[in-house]
From Swiss-Prot:
It is found in: Plastid, Chloroplast. Its main location: plastid. Gene3D superfamilies: 5'-nuclease. The gene is ycf81. Residues 314-375 form the TRAM domain. This is Uncharacterized protein ycf81. The lineage of its organism: Eukaryota, Viridiplantae, Streptophyta, Mesostigmatophyceae, Mesostigmatales. Disulfide bonds: none annotated. Keywords: Chloroplast, Plastid.
């Protein structure tokens, strides 16, 4: 399934590139043809002086150059429109289509008045411009109206279809692309959670997450450096074992390129993930384990007992384990070590074991929303 998602992204990028080329070529040809049409209709004598073929060639190139920026503007607006309607549910899309058809029907009724009106018979340009203006206003107004009241209108017009569409939206849902937070990568449960297949769909690693890990890795603080290296190690393990599910932001194909390159300068790392996911037209599901928001990352229908088993404390009071003492603590005689997930372990009378791996027993656990600290003491004859 994930291979199919990646193939779909690659095909979408290829199709998007071909469509961009088509738009640009279309406007280049349109600009050249429109310029030649203006010359032939309004300035026919211009071709009588000099080389007619050369004049047409130069003017067509000039028309193409003028039409080129117009094509770029149209191309950008078309991409924005596609990303906007990609978020539509079936009911909104159906009612929007009906509103546009109804708006065009009402506009045609009004156009019949314009056709018989003697006032505008001599002003054809104003007549056609008025046609375009009325069509645009009615279509846009109907489109905006049903976007906010699609459920109500669909229940009135086609109640049977409204019920079927409601069931479709509730049952048939596309997999959600999730953002992997930095603190989530360095958490010791991340590998186990992937192994238990709680995470469905694609998982996106933003550039901000890589940058945060790099900052930690380059830090002079021992704990930060340890967490940075641990994060890169776990990220590499995830990419190796779940390469069909993990996607780096740089390889993403269906987002706004302008957003991806510009948002780093205006948002912090938390806001960048939100802008990134909204630009990819996906529901935002982001979590920070240290803030106990694990419920926002996964679907509601999950094995709660298994999730609790994964998220429980690694060691409880009275349990023992081996620990590498890496430095002195703040108080006299204390030694400091770290678990695999970066949890600080304070060892009473452990400063003399710096650089050694000893067996300790847990005396007390401090659990807070920001993390946990284990208080231990060495086991004699360990």
């Amino acid at each position: 399934m994930y291979f199919q998602n990646i193939d779909a992204l690659i095909f979408s990028k290829l199709l998007d590139t071909l469509l961009n080329i088509f738009f640009l070529l279309f406007f280049l040809v349109l600009g050249a043809e429109f310029t030649l049409y203006i010359i032939n209709v309004y300035f026919p004598n211009l071709l009588l002086y000099g080389n007619a073929l050369g004049i047409k060639f130069v003017l067509s190139i000039l028309g193409s150059l003028i039409a080129f920026p117009i094509g770029l503007v149209f191309q950008n607006n078309y991409k924005n429109f596609l990303n906007y309607i990609n978020n539509f549910t079936v009911d909104i899309f159906f009612t929007s289509l009906l509103s546009i058809i109804g708006a065009l029907f009402i506009a045609n009724l009004y156009f019949s008045f314009l056709d018989i009106s003697s006032i505008l018979k001599e002003f054809l340009f104003i007549k056609y411009l008025l046609r375009l203006l009325i069509q645009t206003i009615l279509c846009y107004s109907g489109f905006i109206l049903v976007t906010f009241h699609s459920d109500y209108l669909l229940n009135i017009l086609v109640p049977e279809m409204a019920e079927a569409i409601f069931s479709y939206n509730k049952i048939v849902r596309p997999s959600i692309t999730r953002v992997l937070h930095t603190s989530y990568i360095i958490n010791h449960n991340i590998i186990a959670i992937f192994q238990s297949q709680f995470v469905e769909g694609l998982v996106l690693i933003p550039k901000s997450t890589i940058q945060e890990l790099q900052i930690l890795n380059n830090s002079k603080n021992f704990k930060d450096k340890y967490l940075g290296r641990l994060g890169f190690s776990r990220l590499n393990e995830l990419k190796y074992n779940y390469f069909d599910q993990i996607i780096l932001e740089s390889s993403l194909t269906n987002c706004h390129e302008n957003v991806l390159f510009k948002y780093n300068k205006t948002y912090n790392n938390e806001q960048q993930n939100i802008v990134l996911m909204s630009s990819c037209s996906n529901n935002i599901k982001e979590s920070n384990i240290s803030q106990l928001l694990i419920s926002n990352l996964f679907p509601l229908i999950i094995n709660i007992n298994k999730l609790i088993e994964l998220l429980k404390l690694p060691y409880l009071s009275g349990e023992s384990f081996y620990l590498q003492i890496v430095r002195k603590g703040k108080r006299l005689g204390q030694g400091i070590g770290y678990l695999e997930d970066g949890t600080m372990v304070i060892v009473n009378a452990g400063s003399k074991y710096i650089g050694q791996k000893i067996k300790v027993i847990v005396k007390k656990v401090w659990q807070k929303s920001t993390g946990k600290i284990l208080f231990t003491q060495p086991i004699k004859n360990s």
